[in-house]
Amino acid sequence: MSARPFADLRERLKSGRASLAAAYREKPRAAHYLARHAALVDALLAELSTRLGLARGICLVAVGGYGRGELFPGSDVDVMLLLPAEPLEAERQALESWVQACWDVGLEIGHSVRTVDACLAEADADITVETNLLEARRVWGATALFDDFGRRFRARFDAQRFFDGKLAEQHARHARFDDSAYKLEPNLKDSPGGLRDLHTIHWLAQACDIDAGWSGIARAGLLTEGEARRVAREERWLAKLRIHLHLLAGRREDRLAFDYQSELAACLGLAPTAHRRAGERLMQGYFRAAKLVQRANDILIQSLRVRLFPVVAPPLPIDDDFQLRAGLLEARDPDVFLRKPDALLRAFLVYARHPQLAGFEPTTLRAVWRASARVDRAFRATPAHRALFIALLREPLGVTRALRAMHRYGLLGRYIPAFGRIVGQMQHDLFHVYTVDEHILTVLRNLRRFTVAQLAHEFPLASRLIAAFDKPELLYLAALFHDIAKGRGGDHSALGALDARGFCRQHGLDKTDTDLVAWLVDMHLVMSRTSQKEDISDPKVIAAFAARVGDTRRLDALYLLTVADIRGTSPTVWNAWKGKLLEDLYHAAFARLQGADLAIAGIAARREEARVNLALYGLPRDAADALWRHLDKAYFARFDARDMAWHARMLWRRDATAGAVVRARLSPAGEGIQVMVYAPDRPDIFVRICAFFARIQYTVLEAKIHTTRNGYALDSFQVMDLAHRNIHYRDFLAFVEYELARDLDPARPLQAVQPGRLSRHQRHHPYPAAVHLEADRGGDGQVLSITCADRGGLLFAIAEELMRHEISVYAAKIDTLGERVEDTFLIRGERLNAPPERAALENELRGVLG
């Protein structure tokens, strides 16, 4: 059918939507927009149905969000054509013409055609259909038919079955988002804490015959009027944000993508501050709203469950104030938190001590929520309350879940105000993927996992150290404060250490323990930076690190916090290589703190261990001598005994080869591969190797470059596939050995690598490239430090630029932190002696890095 007969309706829809959008931008009232938009579509559909002469026995029904009277700018118009009987062919054609006319007018409809019997059968078979029909609203047509449908729908409605189905649906939806509201680009509608969580509450309230809306829920006694107003306010804010997002995108878009965050912030009048982008302020507002929505969802679903499934189990006493009922913690008197303020913290201590508790009974949960809002300076200053908080941290079990519950229901941020300030604060550093508060609690969880004997195989050293640590609660305090000063400007480690010191003193810790916690917070980045940026085979590096640490207790604590911290930044940042570097640094520093002279004992011991290793392979004791006579002391200082033995085995009787020898093996670190290259030295070897690994999309983690006395390059690379592709390693190792040897043939032209593209995250949150050159304190070269956004081919681009400046690389450490890299190179070259040349190199590298 031509759209011409309905051109006026099409224009009414277009101009009506434009008017609504303009009015909304001028004065953003979400409920007003949604209702007016639904009314506009109601009028057009009714007129269209009348013009087309749709049979009056038919009823046009709005369902879903449109049925609720909430029509977002980009949402589909979901309708049902309700029929008194199965349609005849002529009626079917008329209905098809009606649907086509809707599209011609510009209405993107989602439609179904059903009789009442078919509706009820579909509702019984599919809870999504049942939910849509729960919000059915007549738009046009047969009132009697719609009333008959309503009566029959309510008569067969099984509230308990509906409740179970919607709860299972919510669990599945949350699982699609990893049960986390704190994604970098959350879904406004479907993520945990999004609008759909609020819709679920409304649907379940309807199932319990509670009047619609938050005021109805308050009248039913499930929330106070004040609590209902708070939840309604957050619902309006989320709806307002979703309307803006649809208008900006020009279509349905529910993901808070990086592309829109800054513009949305501007729509809401949020400006950047000295330390935070406007988009970051927007996202903190979103995450805080999501947290309140999750809290309301928890409380109300529990309350509605009790209405539908009354608990008949008798309570089991726990103490004078709390009891266990049906697996939930229940206050014997909900007013206990008013009469005994210490009961608020005791509730979570009880929760930690009783792992059989699945959560809090809903009335108790509401009482906790209300009481948490009254935590003030006087509450925090009460000695009994401080003692309870420290007692919670000292519990052998349940600490993580108790602190997470305190956080979820608003108590943790009230008790530690500095923690409250970082709730929902995102970190756009291309490294952390969690908000600061979620990261802190994840680090604490990681520390607690080290204490679980059944998980000791995951991190054996960490498990052994924490089992022997006399006061693990000090580690948990350090975890709580290590990033608590993020977003303030300045050094967050130093500022956090001040906060930690004050908190520890207030909570009665002695000077030794207070000093340790504050020191850990201040130094929490030192061990990771040392292991990943410096040459930890150098005794001078170990001596300097050990001097900063001071004693083995601090070393143990710092190692534990560092491993937990790195593992808590992102699911992808930790790898076995980082673990090996940290363990190697720990053992070397421990030996130094115990009085060992690493410079004297290290090389001789490693050489002897390498000879023993060679003998295990049936090689003579002097098998390494031919190679070793061409190597200087630096080689023996930088490689461990296993690597030295491997090199000697692979190069036995091949130390004067004319071509390249490439050997690869699975990395002894337990992840990735180790590649040895031995070839006549040339300026382009490092560049060619970097090009090869870039082409096969492997990330270089570490490179040790050594030149022998007889003019050969003996290089070792630790590389890893960060995409974790499923490949057959035996074939892959053979491929690397053959193809890399071919690429090192000087007769073959160097194959350039095209630079990879930046991710959307990197484009919208650019990370400024930093290049810094300084003298190597331990040698005669220079240390080149580079920090920038990661992309494919980056190391090749850096290596190519260094070669162009006639600079040799003799060591490289590549630290990939999510979408950011922090690379450190030890370099030499005549041009580095001239300050203008050094400045030119830094500038040209910045150009390469973009």
From Swiss-Prot:
Disulfide bond entries: none
Ranges for region Uridylyl-removing: 318-673
GO MF entries: [protein-PII] uridylyltransferase activity; phosphoric diester hydrolase activity
Stated family: Belongs to the GlnD family.
PANTHER family the UniProt entry points to: BIFUNCTIONAL URIDYLYLTRANSFERASE/URIDYLYL-REMOVING ENZYME (PTHR47320), BIFUNCTIONAL URIDYLYLTRANSFERASE_URIDYLYL-REMOVING ENZYME (PTHR47320:SF1)
Domain free text: Has four distinct domains: an N-terminal nucleotidyltransferase (NT) domain responsible for UTase activity, a central HD domain that encodes UR activity, and two C-terminal ACT domains that seem to have a role in glutamine sensing.
Name of the protein described by the UniProt record: Bifunctional uridylyltransferase/uridylyl-removing enzyme
Organism encoding this protein: Thiobacillus denitrificans (strain ATCC 25259 / T1)
